């Protein structure tokens, strides 16, 4: 209740009367999400009273065309009711200035937040006539019985309350301040585009009204993942839950397929065929096969240890330098929250190692020039060690496997590990399973 009380004490929460939809058959006021109708912006007839999933616009129940009760299907009627309101209008100028000053935000996020703010922020009720939800504390309740804090106001506060709870559990109750009050701390809110307004407009207003807490560093909202052209939605049964995939695919295979197709700027249709293609033709063929063939060749010809190296040729030094560049550039892309490009850059690094091997052909030179073959394989192992670091944020499970096969305890730093000659390698196991065409044919999944 700290934020509620502080906002009220600072004059940003006031009491007001509004009209709210009432279901005459159910004899109850309807929460925003219990009112459905046609979106006035895009025409979708499945819009809810708080937002339209189809176009992502935030709505009030009164905005809907031909509203209906989700409980009974009847046409609701308006009745007056008293609520607490958050004075969003008080933050209009300050918020707009802050939004326009953001550097590096995704354009669709910044444009939506600025556009919504420029339309004029309206004071918004933060309570509802409900039987469920967070009740108002008696000392803060001037409204009477039957009022609850509504979800849009309290949900985003969960970020702060979870931080405080974490600090308590750690036995350092003030540690949350390191993240919320230190001006050098950064916060990133990963959401879908239907949550942009809540995280880039409403939550910053709450933080501004509270005073002294860090505003979001970035709100890297994604566009929608679609299935057969329709937006994935658990509530509407479109798409498949992640558990369905984990029963059929390796976790890193799922992560790769999603990360390589992240809808960072546009909606992305993620079909079964596309998932299988990305896993087989990119993850398995490029990265998985590279790791397997280099470690298998080393185990076979150099007693399962990192080979000794002679003086590095230009091609060897160039490869290791390119891997170091891959690490640096991948880190920069991740820092910019350009995650799909970061993964693509890591894959380009793996392709460079494959090109190097095809040019050096250690499987041939091992018979005629064992020293040179050993140097090539040691160089390739070093490159793989560096790439495992670049892949780790995307493919944590298989990256740990690669580290173990290279004789490393774990990946600890964002740099290319140095593999000393003679370092014993772990057992060589395939990282990924090639997918059959029918692996995702289960009809129970969506």
Predicted regions located by residue number:
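Basic, alpha-helical terminal appendages of large translation-related enzymes
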Residues: 16-21, 25-26, 37-56, 67-70, ...
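Short, mixed-charge aromatic SLiMs
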Residues: 183-187, 225-232, 281, 311-325, ...
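Short, charged/polar, low-complexity loop and linker segments
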Residues: 267-272, 324-332
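Conserved, charged catalytic cores of large soluble enzymes
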Residues: 1-121, 165-175, 291-330, 350, ...
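Secondary-structure capping and boundary motifs in well-ordered enzyme cores
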Residues: 31, 144-148, 194-195, 245-246, ...
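Short, amphipathic alpha-helical segments that act as regulatory/interfacial helices
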Residues: 4, 204, 291, 295, ...
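Structured secondary-structure scaffolds
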Residues: 42, 65-300, 344-346
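Helix-loop segments that flank and shape redox-cofactor active sites
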Residues: 139, 176-186, 305, 332-335, ...
């Amino acid at each position: 209740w700290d934020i509620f009380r502080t906002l009220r004490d600072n004059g940003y929460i006031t009491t007001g009367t509004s009209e709210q939809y009432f279901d005459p058959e159910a004899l109850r006021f309807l929460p925003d999400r219990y009112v459905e109708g046609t979106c006035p912006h895009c025409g979708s007839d499945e819009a809810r009273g708080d937002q339209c999933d189809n176009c992502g616009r935030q709505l009030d129940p009164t905005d809907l065309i031909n509203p209906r009760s989700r409980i009974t299907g009847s046409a609701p009627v308006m009745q007056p009711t008293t609520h607490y309101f958050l004075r969003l209008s008080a933050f209009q100028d300050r918020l707009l200035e802050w939004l326009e000053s953001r550097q590096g935000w995704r354009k669709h996020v910044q444009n939506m937040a600025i556009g919504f703010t420029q339309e004029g922020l309206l004071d918004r009720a933060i309570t509802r006539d409900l039987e469920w939800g967070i009740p108002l504390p008696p000392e803060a309740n001037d409204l009477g019985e039957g009022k609850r804090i509504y979800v849009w106001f309290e949900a985003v506060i969960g970020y702060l309350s979870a931080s405080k709870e974490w600090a308590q559990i750690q036995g350092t109750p003030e540690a949350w301040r390191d993240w919320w009050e230190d001006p050098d701390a950064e916060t990133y809110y990963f959401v879908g585009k239907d949550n942009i307004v809540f995280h880039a407009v409403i939550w910053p207003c709450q933080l501004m009204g509270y005073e002294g807490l860090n505003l979001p560093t970035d709100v890297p909202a994604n566009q929608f993942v679609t299935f057969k052209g329709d937006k994935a939605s658990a509530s509407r049964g479109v798409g498949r839950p992640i558990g369905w995939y984990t029963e059929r695919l390796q976790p890193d295979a799922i992560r790769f397929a999603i990360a390589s197709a992240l809808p960072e700027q546009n909606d992305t249709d993620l079909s079964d065929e596309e998932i299988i293609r990305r896993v087989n033709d990119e993850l398995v063929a490029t990265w998985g096969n590279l790791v397997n063939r280099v470690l298998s060749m080393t185990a076979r010809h150099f007693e399962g240890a990192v080979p000794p190296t002679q003086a590095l040729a230009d091609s060897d030094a160039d490869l290791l330098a390119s891997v170091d560049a891959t690490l640096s550039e991948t880190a920069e892309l991740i820092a910019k929250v350009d995650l799909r490009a970061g993964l693509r850059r890591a894959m380009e690094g793996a392709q460079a190692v494959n090109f190097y091997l095809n040019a050096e052909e250690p499987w041939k030179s091992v018979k005629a020039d064992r020293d040179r073959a050993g140097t090539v394989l040691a160089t390739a192992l070093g490159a793989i060690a560096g790439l495992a670091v670049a892949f780790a944020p995307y493919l944590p499970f298989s990256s740990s496997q690669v580290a173990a096969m290279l004789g490393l305890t774990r990946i600890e730093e964002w740099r290319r590990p140095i593999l000393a000659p003679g370092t014993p390698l772990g057992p060589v196991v395939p990282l990924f399973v090639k997918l059959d065409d029918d692996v995702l044919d289960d009809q129970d999944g969506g």
